[in-house]
């Protein structure tokens, strides 16, 4: 049995891509997208017609509506291939505006519903800022399920659990990147691999907290740099993996053992944690890595959203 099939015994495998033509070969349950992945996809010749068709069909509409229609078009194509859910991201430029995030999310869901898709097959991706988490709380209360992304800290995860969001995406690779850069020449790759990887440790701590305290929010590890990080999180509720790493897993027959387990998490001695807004902001501020990576991630997604807008305006 290859590693991909072995992993699927313990974990729901999700494909992290906008390149939906790659999906079928890996048979993922769900798929995730973001502005950067959509931007990358529409610059490929095989996907350029989707952008052109969207601009032509909805000519004269506001650019933000055209953007939403394009990402929903990609989402619909993905949902025609996979059996589960697709995650579609709200414009990252709204990351600090609760009301605007809610409004944009509702429009995205309405666009999916207009295509005949059930609301339960869509997760709205929102950056895990305080404002984003509060938007997710409101959306969940309205029956719209959310995926809180750009999650780098335990405090973000705790606040998401308190808000009863459907799913969180704690990032592994970007945490690894930060610590590796900080260590510089002193970084020991072998010593910091697997269970010692700081990104892996972050997800494990969040998973154990959720399962120990019976928090229903799903944990989907994201942002991987190598298959070792993925295998070290076998048993996590879900893992979203780029096609390149899915291919590496499919090509390897190395063993995959379950690492994360809800029963084991319940036996870990843990103290309950809760955050109000002030406590959340202070905890996030105290975590230099999470503060820097959250800000960097929002800037990057916002920049790619702006580039996508430029491509759409040029195609008009």
UniProtKB/Swiss-Prot annotation:
Q: Which domain of life is it from?
A: Bacteria
Q: For this protein, what is the EC number?
A: 2.2.1.2
Q: In which pathway does it act?
A: Carbohydrate degradation; pentose phosphate pathway; D-glyceraldehyde 3-phosphate and beta-D-fructose 6-phosphate from D-ribose 5-phosphate and D-xylulose 5-phosphate (non-oxidative stage): step 2/3
The record's GO molecular-function terms, alphabetically, read: transaldolase activity
* Active-site positions on this chain: 125 (schiff-base intermediate with substrate)
Cystine crosslinks: none
GO cellular component terms listed in the entry, alphabetical order: cytoplasm
Q: What class of enzyme is it?
A: transferase
UniProt GO BP = carbohydrate metabolic process; pentose-phosphate shunt
Chemical reaction(s) catalysed = D-sedoheptulose 7-phosphate + D-glyceraldehyde 3-phosphate = D-erythrose 4-phosphate + beta-D-fructose 6-phosphate
Q: Where in the cell is it found?
A: Cytoplasm
Q: Does the keyword rRNA-binding apply?
A: no
**Assembly and interaction partners:** Homodimer.
Q: Please give the NCBIfam families that the UniProt record associates with this protein.
A: talAB
Q: Which family does it belong to?
A: Belongs to the transaldolase family. Type 1 subfamily.
Describe its function.
Transaldolase is important for the balance of metabolites in the pentose-phosphate pathway.
**This protein is called what?**
Transaldolase
> Taxonomically, what lineage is the organism?
Bacteria, Pseudomonadati, Pseudomonadota, Betaproteobacteria, Burkholderiales
């Amino acid at each position: 049995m290859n590693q991909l099939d072995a992993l699927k015994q313990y974990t729901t495998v999700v494909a992290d891509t906008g390149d939906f033509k790659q999906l079928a070969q890996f048979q993922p349950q769900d798929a995730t997208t973001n502005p950067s992945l959509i931007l990358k996809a529409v610059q490929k010749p095989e996907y350029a017609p989707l952008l052109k068709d969207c601009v032509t069909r909805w000519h004269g509409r506001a650019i933000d509506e055209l953007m939403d229609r394009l990402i929903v078009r990609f989402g619909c194509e993905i949902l025609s291939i996979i059996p589960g859910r697709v995650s579609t991201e709200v414009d990252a430029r709204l990351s600090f505006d609760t009301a605007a995030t809610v409004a944009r999310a509702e429009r995205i869901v309405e666009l999916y519903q207009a295509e005949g898709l059930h609301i339960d097959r869509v997760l709205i991706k929102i950056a895990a800022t305080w404002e984003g988490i509060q938007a997710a709380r409101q959306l969940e209360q309205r029956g719209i399920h959310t995926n809180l992304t750009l999650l780098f800290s335990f405090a973000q995860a705790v606040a998401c659990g308190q808000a009863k969001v459907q799913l969180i995406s704690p990032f592994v690779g970007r945490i690894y990147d930060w610590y590796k850069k900080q260590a510089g020449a002193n970084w020991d790759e072998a010593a910091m691999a697997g269970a010692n990887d700081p990104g892996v440790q972050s997800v494990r701590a969040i998973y154990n907290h959720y399962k120990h305290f019976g928090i229903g929010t799903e944990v989907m590890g994201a942002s991987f740099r190598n298959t070792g990080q993925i295998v070290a999180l076998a048993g996590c509720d879900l893992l979203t993996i780029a096609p390149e790493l899915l291919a590496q897993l499919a090509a390897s027959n190395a063993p995959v053992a379950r690492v994360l387990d809800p029963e084991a998490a319940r036996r870990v001695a843990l103290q309950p944690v809760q955050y109000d807004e002030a406590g959340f902001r202070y905890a996030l501020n105290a975590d230099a890595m999470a503060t820097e990576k959250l800000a960097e991630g929002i800037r990057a997604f916002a920049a790619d959203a702006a580039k996508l807008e430029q491509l759409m305006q040029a195609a008009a």
